[in-house]
Swiss-Prot record:
SMART domains: FCD (SM00895), HTH_GNTR (SM00345). It comes from Escherichia coli (strain K12). Contains an N-terminal DNA binding region and a C-terminal effector-binding cavity. The C-terminal region also contains a metal binding site. The divalent metal ion is not directly involved in the interaction with DNA, but it plays an important role in interaction with D-galactonate. Transmembrane segments: none annotated. Induction: Part of the dgoRKADT operon, which encodes proteins for the metabolism of D-galactonate. Negatively autoregulated. This is Galactonate operon transcriptional repressor. One of its GO terms (biological process) is negative regulation of DNA-templated transcription initiation.
Length: 229
């Protein structure tokens, strides 16, 4: 995907914040300095600030400019923020927090999917699974299929309130998948088997097996995340 100038500056400044060049509570350079540094206009820098505010990485203070927000206010459900944090430093507390959220949400989704999935839902899940199998050596295509797989499982629950959380859930999953993809023979067959086990449990309307399959999947990805972080 081609990034425009605004996106590139957002990534640069976002990483600088997360990686500690600008610490929480400290000011970012003034607009004029950033315009000179990135050879761009004030309008572009203001767009960048809006994007960083949406990620809750900065706060704007009247007449004073942009300041780095406290770390506990950062939007960890933003895929970019989570990726930048994970690539910068191993934080066992963050890994634990991510696992807690997934363990809380995904097994329940799996159980409800087993109870409620229609034939059309099953076809969507199976289609995504087949794409994962077909693209198991293509990191980007595999991860996109993996996200579609989990989104299809979530959609099969038919809970409109839960579906409103799908963006947040998918952001968390996407950040994890981007870091834990392993195409080697020691990991990929297990990953595919775990996804097939969940699909089979949903297809057979076995809520207990679906819940256990989700827990197994989370445990595996958490293990891989700890190994590489």
């Amino acid at each position: 995907m081609t990034l425009n100038k605004t996106d590139r500056i957002v990534i640069t400044l976002g990483k600088q914040i997360v990686h500690g060049k600008y610490v929480p509570g400290s000011p970012l350079p003034a607009e004029a300095e950033l315009c000179e540094e990135f050879a761009t206009s004030r309008n572009i820098i203001r767009e960048v600030f809006r994007s960083l505010m949406a990620k809750r990485l900065i706060e704007m203070k009247r007449y004073r400019g942009a300041f780095v927000a406290p770390r506990n206010q950062w939007n960890y459900l933003d895929t970019d923020v989570l990726q930048w944090v994970l690539e910068n430093d191993y934080d066992p507390r963050l890994i634990s927090a991510m696992s807690e959220v997934r363990n809380l949400v995904e097994p329940a989704i799996a159980r409800w999917a087993a109870e409620r999935a229609t034939s059309s839902d099953l076809a969507q899940i199976e289609s995504a699974l087949n794409e994962m199998i077909a693209n198991n050596q293509d990191r980007e295509a595999f991860n996109e299929a993996d996200i579609r797989y989990h989104e299809a499982v979530l959609q099969s629950v038919h809970n409109p309130v839960l579906q409103q959380l799908s963006i947040a859930i998918s952001s968390l999953q996407r950040a994890v998948f981007e870091r834990t993809w392993m195409g080697d023979e020691a990991n990929m067959p297990q990953t595919l088997q775990e996804h097939k086990a969940l699909f089979d449990a949903i297809r057979h309307q076995d809520g207990d097996a679906a819940e256990q399959a989700a827990l197994t999947m989370i445990a595996s990805s958490t293990r891989r995340l700890k190994e590489i972080t």
